[in-house]
Amino acid sequence: MTWDWYKSSHDLIVFVSFSMPPDILKELARQAKQTGAVLVLRGFKDESLAATKQAALIMNQTGAEWDIHPDLFKSFKVTKVPTFAVAAADASSVLEDGCAPDTTYATISGNISIRVALDTIRRRASKPIATLAEARLERIRLASRPGSVVR
């Protein structure tokens, strides 16, 4: 599987693992559902599809989107979780080392909220990536207004 299918709608990715504390993983799943982020795992829990499905059902009671995609961990040089990534569509162009060009994405790691990650990326990233982060923050602000139908 390639990064291509993420290009159009997945500019916000949260890299996670079932080794993370359950309360943190549940909270990130809740935030991912609210913000439209996709949660990405490196592989199966206990090398079992059934165990992975069961763990995802327990952790993801809000219905956030999940995927198992080890290549994305490499593409975005993710070595710890949680890591938050904002990526431009051209992040799919992979270099010889299997990584996306540094100018096409920005990441931040740590036990922080998705909003804090987006705001930090907005302030620190290159202009194109900062613009994506700002647009995502604006959608979140609009969606959180009372009576909003923005998703």
Explain the meaning of each model-derived region.
Residues 1-13, 18-59, 92-151:
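Non-globular targeting/processing and membrane-anchoring segments
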Residues 56-81:
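Thioredoxin-like thiol-disulfide oxidoreductase module
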Residues 74-76, 84-86, 116:
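Residues in flexible loops and secondary-structure boundaries
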Residues 82-96:
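A short, hydrophobic beta-strand/beta-hairpin element that forms part of a small beta-sheet core
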